[in-house]
């Protein structure tokens, strides 16, 4: 099995922890992304690579009809329990099980690095009605904060602000226009004893040969920095970046 495929399949083993401990998408940011999409039951918002539904649930809470598309059955199970089987579909960015022009908007959170753009872009363009938007969202640890920077030195975490390069989200090309960037800073809180499970939801950590050493070092760093949280609660700073492009 190729390393990329091994990493892709690692998430299902930690689906419950992923669902509980991955950061939630900021509601204000998601509302701005979908502000003018005019979604209906016939033309919903489509969340591709939806995982266990962190982004899907925010879309739903804002009152937008939403359909989630996720290839991993283990990750899709929490989605189906929350949305119903008819709104949690097996598929991928390269193979979306919807008719032409079905989507008012398409979103994808923390997933573009798994995608083959040469297949995904025309497929997204197919299901998205003209004038609709495609948005790629990244949630990045803010390693401008000292203790988060130290954490990144001992744990294999790629999703951090200093690592991110705008080139990671290239221009989509035809039939899409240029990207518009929105971003928002926020903090996620969880119990310090949940930190190891939170970190295991990242494939680069879960599959590392020295994973237990990395997790022990992470707990030690949090303990050494009072500013990381209070009363046994970790306060992890993040920046969400959303890149939206309009379908011509």
Question: Residues of each region from the PLM?
Answer:
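Class I SAM-dependent methyltransferase SAM/SAH-binding core
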Residues: 44-46, 52-95
């Amino acid at each position: 099995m190729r390393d990329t495929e091994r990493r892709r399949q690692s998430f299902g083993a930690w689906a419950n922890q992923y669902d509980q401990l991955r950061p939630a998408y900021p509601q204000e940011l998601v509302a701005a992304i979908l502000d003018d999409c005019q979604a209906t039951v016939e033309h919903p918002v489509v969340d591709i690579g939806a995982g266990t539904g962190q982004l899907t649930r925010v879309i739903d809470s804002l009152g937008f009809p939403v359909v989630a598309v996720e290839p991993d059955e283990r990750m899709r199970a929490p989605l189906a329990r929350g949305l119903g089987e008819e709104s949690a579909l097996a598929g991928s960015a390269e193979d979306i099980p919807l008719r032409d022009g079905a989507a008012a908007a398409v979103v994808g959170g923390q997933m573009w690095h798994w995608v083959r753009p040469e297949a995904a872009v025309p497929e997204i363009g197919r299901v998205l009605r003209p004038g609709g938007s495609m948005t790629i969202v990244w949630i990045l640890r803010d390693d401008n904060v000292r203790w988060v920077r130290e954490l990144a030195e001992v744990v294999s975490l790629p999703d951090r602000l200093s690592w991110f390069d705008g080139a990671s989200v290239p221009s989509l090309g035809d039939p899409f226009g240029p990207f518009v960037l929105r971003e928002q800073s926020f903090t996620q809180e969880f119990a310090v004893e949940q930190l190891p499970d939170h970190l295991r939801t990242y494939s680069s950590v879960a599959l590392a040969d020295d994973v237990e050493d990395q997790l022990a070092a992470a707990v030690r760093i949090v303990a050494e920095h009072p500013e990381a949280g209070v009363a046994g609660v970790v306060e992890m700073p993040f920046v969400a970046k959303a890149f939206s492009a309009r379908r011509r």
